[in-house]
């Protein structure tokens, strides 16, 4: 096992405890990121479905608005000059809010009307009904465009967040966790090898002590048999206490 396949660490009981804690932390992080990815994917699919529905509705609304414009021009004449002259400031404005999905911030756009209708009196002479219908259709078109912009922005943001989250999950699952597991296996192998070496060393020491003891006892027996070693005298057996008489 090369050094690149595992973390460079001195094998010890403390290192084993640290690696076990790191492995547990990596597994917990992987599980949390998977849950985050699932939540983002669920919201991503919901937004994708909503985008498809909004685009289909947008096509119908824009087609209806185009027909209304042609009808209004046919009835009321060319009113583009009047519309341009009455423009002072935007009546339809956009504000942005934020939505949070599993820690990912999504922008949400909303449209609102500000001020009075500058074209309220347009079409009093003729074509008033057609102009009112035209305004309603294009107001609906603006509403759908803002909603579609919000959905598509959220779509792109979620797509990038899901890719990043999945890359992190894959990195933890296929790189970090296996590397920690290989390091942990290396530490356990080294510690087991040390224990075997220590057991073998102690066993050899005991065997050597036993051999030396047996050799010493054998030499002592041989010296005793040759009379070189005298048996120690029993001092207690030779001593005789005098009788004490008390008058």
Swiss-Prot record:
Pfam families: ATP-synt_D
Ion transport as UniProt keyword: yes
Alphabetical keyword list: Cell projection, Cilium biogenesis/degradation, Cytoplasm, Cytoplasmic vesicle, Cytoskeleton, Hydrogen ion transport, Ion transport, Membrane, Transport
Keyword Membrane: yes
Superkingdom classification of source: Eukaryota
Gene Ontology molecular function, alphabetical: proton-transporting ATPase activity, rotational mechanism
Membrane topology of the entry: Peripheral membrane protein
Main location group: membrane
Localization annotation: Membrane; Cytoplasmic vesicle, Clathrin-coated vesicle membrane; Cytoplasm, Cytoskeleton, Microtubule organizing center, Centrosome; Cell projection, Cilium
GO CC list: centrosome; cilium; clathrin-coated vesicle membrane; vacuolar proton-transporting V-type ATPase, V1 domain
Biological process annotations from GO: cilium assembly; protein localization to cilium
Role this protein plays: Subunit of the V1 complex of vacuolar(H+)-ATPase (V-ATPase), a multisubunit enzyme composed of a peripheral complex (V1) that hydrolyzes ATP and a membrane integral complex (V0) that translocates protons. V-ATPase is responsible for acidifying and maintaining the pH of intracellular compartments and in some cell types, is targeted to the plasma membrane, where it is responsible for acidifying the extracellular environment. May play a role in cilium biogenesis through regulation of the transport and the localization of proteins to the cilium.
Self-association state and partner proteins as the record states: V-ATPase is a heteromultimeric enzyme made up of two complexes: the ATP-hydrolytic V1 complex and the proton translocation V0 complex. The V1 complex consists of three catalytic AB heterodimers that form a heterohexamer, three peripheral stalks each consisting of EG heterodimers, one central rotor including subunits D and F, and the regulatory subunits C and H. The proton translocation complex V0 consists of the proton transport subunit a, a ring of proteolipid subunits c9c'', rotary subunit d, subunits e and f, and the accessory subunits ATP6AP1/Ac45 and ATP6AP2/PRR. Interacts with SNX10.
Family, per entry: Belongs to the V-ATPase D subunit family.
Official protein name in the record: V-type proton ATPase subunit D
